[in-house]
């Protein structure tokens, strides 16, 4: 017959004969008690400080017993610090601290009294009741207790063990090693050295067991790895080194000090057939959990009466929640509309229109905390009927359970709960929850956390995230009690916690033969990139030789050959189609990078549309184009007068609004921040163009707008005796100034290299250089216009009107040497190169400077 097994906590609870209250149930009960004394805080504010105080209170009761003494000490200390309280600011930090401890001296004893009335107890109170019942329990204890593998006891646990030992009703077996047990400098043996001095250990009872295994030769390797996830990528190599002949991985453990590495670790161990995972998969790291976090953030904004939804608050929720086929289509259309119209802030009406029919649309509607809780419970129930994988099912089930628990816990109270409060309560449950895996503990590779290694020995151990701050945790206690107060009253500090971690580490290593310690050498956030001090201790204090291995991501550039794409028959067929519709912009694309031309014109790929939170240069240019087209479109075909342009100047605001409407952007997009600035700059550019033309007219120049956004098509251009291509495109503006026909191309960029010097040697390849792309476009536009009957035999000027230099007016192409006809030779040759089957598309690499 097997003996009855207890954890030490279970035994302490049994002796106390009290029902423990913890977590949310305790918080809500405590708040109700608090409001009987003070009515100055709502539940959300109370929950910001009470959970930390409650842990401190439990520590007072567990390790000192007299919480009143510590509370009075804290009050006295604050009064000393605040000796001049009536001389200064009544609301200063010290004043607030003093008032806090005054309240706690009244509140915590009152809370204890109220809990006792309900026969309830916190973890700390459980220890007090156990202490009271201990002697009677031990006296009537008729079995034999065996305590195995302990390291650090609370005072009550220690008294329980020692009392049973004194009455010869128990045995105790520790697990230690001479290396850290006999060396006073070793924090790992701190508690065990104290226990060795118990009077219960004498000639008739030995202190068992102290081994001498740590000093046995070991193969220890320390890996300095550049990156957190990168540590997991080293695992297959280490495992292949350990198991050269077989792959059952018997007697091998992988220990994760950072639970967030579990998904990446499982990916790296995909080839391992037998794997037992004793640590749970943290619920907070799964997609559904992330969606819930985003959802609560969204509802907090709605609770503050937000008039619209920020698109980036909506999209992650839609992306990460499980959905059916109908939902997928609705979301696809929703995203397409946002991208097409560049909707950054979505009105409630728009959201209703765009997501109408979504099965979980009600999650986005504004509702109070109680209604939202019921909505989430129903949502989780419905989701479980969808086709989802086992991990998702468990994830959703845990959330449903948590929502129901919170609803049941809140129901006895009449609290006005805010969304923020509901979020805190849910996080309390979810952050401590994990999805458990089913495995075979007696075979295969073991994957676990450090605390799960207690009482277990492995021949081969691999420890990941062996960083300072992870092992040990260091001075990261969340407490209201200063270090000196904790030391004064024998409460655990980070020093005791370091000792506990040190014991787990050294005890786990002492029986191993092959030890692999990996740490992340990159400093990021709370990670300093420093290896744990325990590794340094082994290096400096033990006889073991350690092999150090550095694994880093190389930052050296990889020399890659430019991409080359041959012109296959199918590509040549596409080029024949392209010949029927050649735009000047196509040649510009080819000049910049032939591969871009191939992707765009042969494969017909397009850049994906993305939502712009700040107006892009492309859309800024379109905004100005559209506004100018709207204004000048009213005066096409007439010789302009001063009042024509003055009237247009009064309509600039209207033109900008019409341009925004044509872009399908929301007016709200331009109401604040940099987008407001861009709108004002666009307005100023439009005004500057009008004013420039106005000055021309005032000086007696004859100006007529002939066309705007003039479409040119079916313009034949001979490239050799047997072949021709057809040009097409759009010209931003055609006007006549004092009898000269002007072709004007609007640009957001500055004009470059418009003065052309065609040398005899360069006539064939002038426009093969990217720097002449603007001039090439203008020459092609001039050719196209010269082929149209209504413009034949006209004197033509072509130029750029740059929005960046708007006050300079039109800057024309100028032939310093050579002429317009000469320029067309290189246009012809460039097209011939594109069509040449023997010339592949070769990537042109442009240097970038960061």
Named regions from a protein language model:
Residues 1-7, 12-21, 203-807, 814-850:
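Anion-coordinating catalytic cores for phosphoryl-, nucleotidyl-, and glycosidic chemistry
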Residues 2-140, 155, 332, 336-342, ...:
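Basic/charged alpha-beta structural segments of nucleotide/phosphate-handling enzymes
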Residues 183-206, 294-297:
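Ligand-binding grooves and catalytic loops that recognize ribose/phosphate and carbohydrate rings
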Residues 40, 84, 92-95, 112-115, ...:
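Generic N-terminal initiation segments characterized by hydrophobic and/or small/turn-forming residues
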Residues 43-45, 54-94, 98-101, 178-180, ...:
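Low-complexity, compositionally biased segments
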Residues 85-190, 221-227, 459-460, 624, ...:
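Conserved helicase NTPase motor core
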Residues 50, 167, 788:
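Acidic-histidine catalytic/liganding microenvironments
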